[in-house]
Every structure is written in C-alpha cells, then in structure tokens.
Amino acid sequence: FITYALFSKLENEDQLAGVLGHEIGHVIGRHSAERMAKQGLTQSIVSGVAVGIDPSTAQGAAAIANTLNMKYGRGDELESDDLGVKFMMDAGYNPAELIGVMKILKEAAGPNRTPERLSSHPDPENRIEKIKEAIEKYRK
C-alpha cells in the first residue's frame, strides 16, 4: 500500500511507478503469507521455550524471535525493491527514480531513525545500493 504522506512527497509518475512496483513485488513474492507463517513458527518456539523457564529467559527468547522476524522482513523489502526495478524497466519507467523514493523515505525518517537491526525495513542507504545493483542487473 501507499500512504497519502508518501504519495504527497513523490515528485513524478516514475516514483509512483516505483512504489507500486515495489508493492506488487510483495504480492508476487507472497511476503505476507510467508511472514505470517514465520511469525507463527517463531511464536510456537518461544511458547515452547517459555514453558517451565523463568520469565527473563522467555523474554530473551521472544527478543531473539522478534529480531529474526525483522531480518526476514528486511529481506522481503530488498526483494520487492529488486522486483520493483524490474517492473519499472519492463513498463518503460526510469528505475533510478526509485532511488529518489528512498531519499524521500530517509528524509522523512529524520536523523533519529530506528537502527536497521531493530527495523523491519533496511536503511534507505542500503536500499539505494541494492537498487543500483538491480538496475545494472536488469540492463544486461
């Protein structure tokens, strides 16, 4: 999905195409279904660990599970960025404009943004590098 806040900051149709291509990438990659399955699995493991163990150990297991789920989320975001680049190129849009979207997201997050390791989304700078790699990959 796209929020009005992001939509209002987009500078051109190519950037909108990039956001929509990214979101279609989530659908094609079945990321929602995979994330729900992974969260269910880690929740089951944490519940099993929590039985008969002190609360602090259970909290530690929950924190580890949460970190693992965020790592999977970051991978999904990078895969969707990659697919978004491909879809943009296939449709005749300028894929470099997806980099502009990442700059908008970086600016919106400000200097106190959540560290990547604690976020479900990769840092915009890392995403920019991966987008550049995807552009080169699909130009060949």
Regions found by a protein language model. Give the residues of each.
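A Zn2+-metalloprotease active-site environment signal
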Residues: 1-140
